[in-house]
Curated annotation (Swiss-Prot):
Keywords from the named record: Ribonucleoprotein, Ribosomal protein, RNA-binding, rRNA-binding
Protein name, entry field: Small ribosomal subunit protein uS8
Description of how the protein assembles with itself and partners: Part of the 30S ribosomal subunit.
Family to which the UniProt record says this protein belongs: Belongs to the universal ribosomal protein uS8 family.
NCBIfam families in UniProt: PRK04034.1 (NF003115)
Role this protein plays: One of the primary rRNA binding proteins, it binds directly to 16S rRNA central domain where it helps coordinate assembly of the platform of the 30S subunit.
One GO term (biological process): translation
Organism of this sequence: Thermococcus kodakarensis (strain ATCC BAA-918 / JCM 12380 / KOD1) (Pyrococcus kodakaraensis (strain KOD1))
Length: 130
């Protein structure tokens, strides 16, 4: 059986493990996009360290959880967003103003909606975390 959306599977796995109180979680299969999303979550203090373990196949990410995630999910479909429209999407996916992050794939890489707004660039919404 194949995964239809590995990013959504990884984020729901992280959310479920946080709710049960686990300290670490293993995410497979690994991909560049999942790695970039984990990097953004690490920079914003939602997870601890993470590392890529080579299993001879697609790889596995081992993620340390610190108990700061209430909910994380993938945004489907991947909506295109202009720089001036982030507030509308923030109201739609986040529970309160300045609480949580939207993760955006831009031409300059994967970043939060706040960083993209500072740079004045748009992109595609791929996930939210709060």
């Amino acid at each position: 059986m194949t995964l239809l959306d590995p990013l959504a599977n990884a984020l729901s796995h992280i959310t479920n493990s946080e709710r049960v109180g686990k300290k670490e979680v293993y995410i497979k299969p690994a991909s560049k996009l999942i790695g970039e999303v984990l990097r953004v979550m690490l920079e914003n203090g939602y997870i601890g360290e993470f590392e890529l373990i080579d299993d001879g196949r697609a790889g596995i990410y081992r993620v340390q959880l610190i108990g700061k995630i209430n909910k994380a999910g993938a945004i489907k479909p991947r909506f295109p967003v202009k720089a001036r429209d982030y507030e509308k999407w923030e109201k739609r996916f986040l529970p309160a103003f300045e609480f949580g992050i939207l993760i955006v794939s831009t031409s300059q890489g994967v970043m939060t909606h706040k960083e993209a707004l500072e740079k004045g660039i748009g992109g595609r919404l791929i996930a939210y975390v709060y």
